[in-house]
């Protein structure tokens, strides 16, 4: 986003598990149709819109609450980097090296004049300005926004690799440059402690896994009429999601277990939409309203009792640019 009140351009959760020595990057599709408990109901009386609007209308608290409600996970911290600050983070670590496809280089060089030309290749080094442009392109191929989320995770992975060869002093210097330009609920002392642990325990050498939520098959393209800001009902191109199934999948990936049971009576929100209904965002119940009607249900509440106890408070989320929060650990892996 261009400011602290813009829509989130990237929503990426970073999970670091010291027990399994694994980092997981999860991109949330920003056009996901969801309920959000925004404080100003006049902005959207139905409180249903695209996921990235939760940041614009309610800031970090509403964004985090929405993700927690939809996917039944816990998020403790956030780090937000805007478009002006993002290049500084890249440059502070000496740039990033990654594979650039010929069609990506051609598209960037043809559509962007404010940066140095980018070459294609298996190991191309980008500076901060070039990396920002790379993370934002989405009309370059048929993958669209899915391709963009993949490029955002590629940049984060490349950043972690850049940090592998840095000294603790270099990492501290990078933080001194970046911290004045980010928004976070981490204290500076906490960040220094995390950096010290990351360096001593070689977190940057952990295996890195990537995911997109919802995954393929758990969402469908939809056109829904809803309130957009203070404007009367407007058509919204979005994704209708089977949240209980998606939440169960994410819990298993992050925690290694789940407390979500998908019963035989489960009716997918996707099926409801395909039947000409706009599903209430409870998702796990056989309910819906005719297209273009109001949505009154809060975020989906599938058969969840409590958060999995093994690995709660494990994850970070980012908004609005493409940087992950500093890694936190699952409780069971804490020192």
Language model features with spans:
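Non-catalytic, solvent-exposed segments at the cell envelope interface
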Residues: 1-335
């Amino acid at each position: 986003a261009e400011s602290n009140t813009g829509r989130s351009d990237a929503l990426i959760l970073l999970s670091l598990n010291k027990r399994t020595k694994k980092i997981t990057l999860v991109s949330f599709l920003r056009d996901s149709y969801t309920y959000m408990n925004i404080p100003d109901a006049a902005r959207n009386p139905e409180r249903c819109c695209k996921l990235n609007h939760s940041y614009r209308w309610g800031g970090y608290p509403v964004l985090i609450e929405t993700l927690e409600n939809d996917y039944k996970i816990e998020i403790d911290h956030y780090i937000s980097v805007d478009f002006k600050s993002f290049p500084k983070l890249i440059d502070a670590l000496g740039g990033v090296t990654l594979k650039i496809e010929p069609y990506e280089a051609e598209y960037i060089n043809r559509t962007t004049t404010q940066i140095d030309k980018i070459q294609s290749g298996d190991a191309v080094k980008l500076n901060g300005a070039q990396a920002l442009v790379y993370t934002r392109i989405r009309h370059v191929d048929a993958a669209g926004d899915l391709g963009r989320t993949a490029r955002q995770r590629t940049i984060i992975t490349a950043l972690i690799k850049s940090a592998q060869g840095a000294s603790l002093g270099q990492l501290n210097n990078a933080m001194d440059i970046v911290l004045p330009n980010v928004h976070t609920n981490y204290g500076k002392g906490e960040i220094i402690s995390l950096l010290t642990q990351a360096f001593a325990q070689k977190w940057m050498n952990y295996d890195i896994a990537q995911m997109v939520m919802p995954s393929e098959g758990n969402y469908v393209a939809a056109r829904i009429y809803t309130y957009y800001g203070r404007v009367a009902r407007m058509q919204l191109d979005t994704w209708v999601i089977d949240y209980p199934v998606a939440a169960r999948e994410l819990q298993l990936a992050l925690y290694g277990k789940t407390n979500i049971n998908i019963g035989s009576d489960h009716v997918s929100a996707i099926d409801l939409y395909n039947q000409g209904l706009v599903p209430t965002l409870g998702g796990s119940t056989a309910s819906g309203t005719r297209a273009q009607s109001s949505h009154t249900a809060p975020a989906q509440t599938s058969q969840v009792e409590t958060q999995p106890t093994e690995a709660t408070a494990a994850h970070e989320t980012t908004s609005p640019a493409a940087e992950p929060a500093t890694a936190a650990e699952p409780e069971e892996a804490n020192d």
